[in-house]
Amino acid sequence: MSQHPRFIATWRDELPGFYTELTPTPLNNSRLLCHNAPLAQALELPETLFDYQGPAGVWGGETLLPGMAPLAQVYSGHQFGVWAGQLGDGRGILLGEQQLSDGCKLDWHLKGAGLTPYSRMGDGRAVLRSTVREFLASEAMHGLGIPTTRALTIVTSDTPVRRETTERGAMLMRIAESHVRFGHFEHFYYRREPERVRELAQYVIEHHFAHLAQEEDRFALWFGEVVTRTAQLMASWQCVGFAHGVMNTDNMSILGLTMDYGPYGFLDDYQPGFICNHTDYQGRYAFDNQPGVGLWNLQRLAQALSPIIPAERLNALLDDYQPALLREWGRQMRAKLGFTVEKEGDNDYLRELLTLMAREGSDYTRTFRMLSETEQHSSASPLRDEFIDRATFDAWFARYRARLEEEGEEDDARQRLMKSVNPALVLRNWLAQRAIEAAERDDASELSRLLEALRNPFADRDDDYTHRPPDWGKHLEVSCSS
């Protein structure tokens, strides 16, 4: 293993005018709080880079590694359905692009790195609370198999940062194949610079959709893949019970990654209209609205791409979104029920169960995990005691067991399949809050313990991580402030 990773700078070299070069602004008395050891190993990084005793170094923006060329990218976007103009990157700096030994290229993005020319009225900082939440969420989603940016390190400090209250400044090193957002394209479309839209699209195709690079119709084919990836991501969110909270177009990844973890939340009680962001007064980004918002955001991206793709082709590709969404959602939800063969009427079993869960406020994650224990030849179910309306549950469960018998699968094999898609553990807000409170005392032990559990969310476990949330943790409100 080399002493230092190798960095290249394709964004800087190939896209002049898309960024401003600058270096991070360090925090006061910054120090490394935690690092993601499995990710560090995948990135071929030596352990000597992670020094918990000395200065924060590269993790706190105090030094740069050889080959790094730090810059802030420029992008715009729609926020809560309204064009907001230029938005960022107001506190994040792309330090460089790491070239791995297998040829893979990954961004190193330092969040909370200080003011940039795109900071608007912001202070360029992130607080410890939000960096811990993003660190945990990105690794939780990765553990669930959902496309996401990753988190490598958290640095804490003695720098005070004002939000609703005064909090501790922090930085997070985010790793991703790309940080290109829908809003990057919108920025140049609204600036009436269609040649820049084409230039950026060509860059994205060459670096991230190389199989399309030689196609004459490459721009349309690429947009079609973005539509499909976005539809599949929305389906995955719905199936695991994840609410993003702030699906503005500048928070949408061109690669179909979950990114920009802010006021997110995983469902506790199954509430289809769950709103995790307490500043989302109209419920625009409520849980059950997310698939529709995904399409709306794609329509905004299509508008930005209209200088390089004919309108009729864009509309035809957008029409593929709903079928792709329903296919992926249906595939994943059938697996959650233990159905490996698609049959007419399968959606009825799901709709009836979800209706009962919504009426009774059943815990989303626990219900499907307990359903995984079903024995098709037994009328008894541990899930029965979770419902007040047991007559309705009994009637549904009898039909469900009959449907399972049609699968012809032994209980053990089916239960293994169901447990591989129905997690025992998700990152509930109260679990994150407990880790945050410890981290604010410079104690990373709960953060490390929770992180280890989130890496294996499908494993059988019986501890406080899988119990119902306590009363104080059931309806925690989360805001956009970070």
Curated annotation (Swiss-Prot):
**InterPro entries given for it?**
adnlytase_SelO, SelO
The reactions it catalyses are:
L-seryl-[protein] + ATP = 3-O-(5'-adenylyl)-L-seryl-[protein] + diphosphate; L-threonyl-[protein] + ATP = 3-O-(5'-adenylyl)-L-threonyl-[protein] + diphosphate; L-tyrosyl-[protein] + ATP = O-(5'-adenylyl)-L-tyrosyl-[protein] + diphosphate; L-histidyl-[protein] + UTP = N(tele)-(5'-uridylyl)-L-histidyl-[protein] + diphosphate
Q: What EC number(s) does its UniProt record assign?
A: 2.7.7.-, 2.7.7.108
Q: Where along the chain is ATP bound?
A: 88, 90-91, 111, 123-124, 174, 181, 260
Q: Which cofactor does it need?
A: Mg(2+); Mn(2+)
The molecular function terms of the Gene Ontology recorded here are: AMPylase activity; ATP binding; magnesium ion binding
Which residues are involved in binding Mg(2+)?
251, 260
Q: Which Pfam families match?
A: SelO
Superkingdom of this protein's organism? Bacteria
Keywords of the record: ATP-binding, Magnesium, Manganese, Metal-binding, Nucleotide-binding, Nucleotidyltransferase, Transferase
- Give the positions the UniProt entry annotates as the active site: 250
Purpose of the protein: Nucleotidyltransferase involved in the post-translational modification of proteins. It can catalyze the addition of adenosine monophosphate (AMP) or uridine monophosphate (UMP) to a protein, resulting in modifications known as AMPylation and UMPylation.
- Family of this protein: Belongs to the SELO family.
Mind telling me what this protein is named? Answer: Protein nucleotidyltransferase YdiU
